[in-house]
């Protein structure tokens, strides 16, 4: 089931950019060999490091529990992280009378009215053709939402971001840049050439191993991988800078770094939900622990393994596992340690096999050919009405996006 949802997640995320204006290109679209681009979203530039860039241009990955969006930056890679159970709202020590958001009466024109009567009024308004009154009354059926979280109305929260800050690279000197999401394997990649060295990053979120895996390589020439790894939880609504400060999005956490592993552990202030993430950095060069980061130096191959979890449990009335912070730490560490005991090729093979078990059940051939144009260029031609017949078959404008970084973001 989860693998199927992962397939749907990737497939339906394809056309999310089709619903938005496409930024103008400043140079000719770089062409690629067509057979390399079958079932791929690919671009010749990074996603803007902004809310708009996240929503329309980052590359989404997920395993039904952990979500990741890859921006593909050159001097700084940003991978936005999510964990499906990280919600504010619900039972809390500050809400002893919390009743699941159910309300028995609501205020209609200054009078507390039973919900059953409101429903009857809505039906009568629709029947008489008074849609404006019906719509106004429908709003009375919705639980109260407030940023302070006093009513227990919850929001889905961004976990935070993993940042890879690269050293010794001048972005303007990079060539042959390509950022792609392969729908056949559910792997997001970034590659480019710099000073005679070919740099590649691969990312996937494995359902069998319950981890996000990021692999970086540097081949050819004398170039090495030199960068810092950081994991920064969000303390703002939706993980963006657009709505900071409200209590229902705030959290407390500690970051510890030991032996090339970054552990973030904390609680949400609103409902005391515990969360934990662990990120292990494995490199063929050197790794150095910092206060809140791991520094990689002189490497040609680096694997980063991350897992995230909370103490949420779908069980009335507390909706918690009852785990201590230490027990949650042990559980997340177990995922990471088991995955780290496998080599990268094994992790990737496990992921691809699991994903393709579902994805390859159906193959739809519309007579299209792999495109030699980037995905954003295809969308530009489609919107302008200049796409060829074959290119129109590649358009995803008929499908529906499933991701949103806002507080009501949908996640499988």
Walk through the language-model features, giving the residues of each.
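Sec-dependent N-terminal signal peptides
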Residues: 1-8
């Amino acid at each position: 089931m989860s693998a199927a949802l992962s397939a749907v997640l990737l497939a339906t995320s394809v056309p999310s950019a089709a619903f938005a204006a496409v930024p103008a290109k400043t140079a000719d679209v770089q062409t690629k060999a067509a057979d390399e681009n079958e079932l791929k979203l690919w671009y010749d530039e990074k996603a803007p490091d902004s809310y708009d860039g996240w929503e329309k241009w980052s590359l989404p990955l997920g395993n039904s529990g952990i979500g990741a969006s890859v921006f593909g930056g050159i001097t700084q890679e940003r991978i936005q992280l999510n964990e499906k159970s990280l919600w504010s709202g619900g039972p809390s020590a500050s809400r002893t009378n919390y009743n699941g958001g159910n309300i028995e009466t609501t205020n209609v024109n200054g009078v507390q009215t039973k919900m059953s009567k409101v429903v009857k009024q809505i039906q009568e308004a629709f029947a008489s053709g008074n849609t404006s009154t019906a719509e106004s009354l429908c709003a009375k059926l919705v639980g109260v939402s407030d940023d302070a979280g006093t009513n227990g109305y919850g929001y889905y929260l961004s976990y935070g971001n993993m940042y890879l800050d690269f050293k010794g690279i001048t972005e303007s000197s990079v060539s042959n840049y390509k950022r792609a999401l392969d729908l056949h394997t559910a792997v997001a990649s970034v590659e480019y050439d710099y000073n005679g060295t070919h740099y590649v990053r691969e990312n996937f979120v494995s359902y069998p191993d319950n981890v996000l895996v990021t692999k970086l390589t540097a081949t050819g020439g004398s170039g090495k991988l030199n960068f810092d790894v950081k994991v920064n939880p969000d303390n703002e609504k939706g993980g963006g800078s657009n709505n900071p400060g409200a209590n229902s999005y705030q959290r407390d956490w500690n970051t510890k770094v030991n032996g090339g592993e970054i552990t973030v552990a904390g609680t949400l202030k609103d409902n005391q939900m515990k969360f934990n993430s662990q990120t292990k950095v494995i490199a063929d060069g050197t790794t150095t622990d910092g206060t809140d980061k791991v520094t990689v130096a002189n490497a040609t191959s680096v694997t980063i393994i991350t897992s995230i979890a909370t103490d949420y449990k779908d069980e009335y009335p507390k909706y918690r596992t009852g785990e201590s912070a230490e027990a949650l730490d042990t559980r997340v560490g177990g995922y990471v340690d088991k995955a780290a005991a496998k080599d990268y090729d094994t992790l990737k093979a496990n992921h691809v096999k699991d994903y393709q078990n579902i994805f390859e059940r159906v193959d739809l051939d519309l007579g299209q050919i792999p495109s030699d144009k980037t995905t954003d260029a295809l969308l530009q031609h489609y919107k302008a009405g200049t796409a060829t017949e074959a290119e129109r078959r590649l358009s995803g404008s008929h499908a529906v996006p499933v991701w949103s970084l806002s507080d009501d973001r949908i996640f499988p």
